[in-house]
């Protein structure tokens, strides 16, 4: 059986040898050139390939059409990936009739993604292993061929655990490769409910947070000790690296990071204490903890902590256009909870942000983006991060006022994009789940899903294509002129202050606000085409936390990226949303202040939205980018979001009525 192999690291070497032993005909080996900035403690795939007299390549992009064509000419039957660091495209995988198979260093579906051995130690796991699975579009998500478990000992480090996983991988391959070859392998689908995903780790992730427990800190030390860069902290401006540590059940009343003893060197933690058994300063030698204390002049009661800034860092200035809107006012609230940000905002109203007007870090001007262009350009020049949140985003307006949608959503926002290019400012642009249109993928993927819209006479798509065109323009400015950007795509965010009931009265609101208006006024709940359309509803607090992390942009991971922000587990039809809302309404303490429920009424969408409307049956996001780039996962159940949103509107309605 002819095989193409993508491999790196010790496990890549083990994979090559196992395939050779199993009688596979290896046509070519693809690997990576070694990074001179990395401690290459592992064996060389290139060297093993040469010893086996195999052709070895190390292209920068194996998914490039030229390489795909070369691999096609090799006519592989099967493809293997053993710790190869890049994703293989669907087109490449399709070249092998038997498919592609990857060896992963965890017990999938747990610890998908990068550095699974290190992450397992960081999180204090007691078991991991090796998994051989089929490769699919989503990383580490294909059917499992086989697994071998490995026990994690209390004294295991990343290196010792890696060696255990390597032995498990060798045994697993010896067991399963013959079965794949003769067609007797069995496959088990992964349980998505148990899946977890972890992103890449960098040296900066080794910083010790002393408010954590001694056990958690020791787990970090074990995960990043030699041959990795090590866990570290600071004594003033001087860096201290911890190579080995011991957890102590010591009670104390000191602040975390305080030195309790210098011989042995013991540090107070949020819970318990940590003895530094061995370490070094950043220009010294590997020494015992007590010797390290002597070398660095560490004395009892001093505190280890993060490296202090030499000068006070200026707050990041964030410009929010459309600050009074649903996303804008919730984002302002989140930013003001963090002292690192000053917010500058513009909008045509201030009812939703009135609670912030007395805050010295919030600067607001009432105005229209189509008129106040000079003010906007000045503040783009002045600020660091720009969020143009002004848009018409209610479905009925797409058919009722298509030209106004285009003028505001595209033309006015294009001016802002160009000012960001002009002044070299970072823009975080609100794309939309609408850009996916009638995409037929099960999950909408930022990097691979097709963007499919309807015919020209269906004017509802003018919003989608206006946003999509801006996405493409921003992407092009990034590629050609260095614009720093992130595109985020909200999937049906809900919560308090979403639209208002006056907007719902003229049909210019999102679904849940329209449904709440029906309940408040005692009118029938209108379900367009029976309400069978499914959406994934996302709590505003979950969404804003993801957006906040995009603004933070740790290690620049979000630069040039597109990020879906949605909750795939909160999928429901509009009818199910209405039924959930009705149940919450009937159980609300203010229920008796409102009319009786008038029932459900099925309505044709064309009669409500107009002839140019066209709906979509489902819209489910892939959130792999959000998990990978933001370390973000939605947590709030839809029932809670519905209850919170309803409560806000009911209490607001009663207060306004009592005030009148």
UniProtKB/Swiss-Prot annotation:
GO terms for cellular component: membrane. Keywords: Antibiotic resistance, Lipid A biosynthesis, Lipid biosynthesis, Lipid metabolism, Lipopolysaccharide biosynthesis, Multifunctional enzyme, NAD, Oxidoreductase, Transferase. NAD(+) binds at residues 347, 368-369. The record marks 102 as: Transition state stabilizer. Residues 314-660 are annotated as: Dehydrogenase ArnADH. Its EC number is 2.1.2.13, 1.1.1.305. The active site is at 104 (proton donor), 434 (proton acceptor), 619 (proton donor). (6R)-10-formyltetrahydrofolate binds at residues 114, 136-140. Homohexamer, formed by a dimer of trimers. This is Bifunctional polymyxin resistance protein ArnA. It comes from Serratia proteamaculans (strain 568). The gene is arnA.
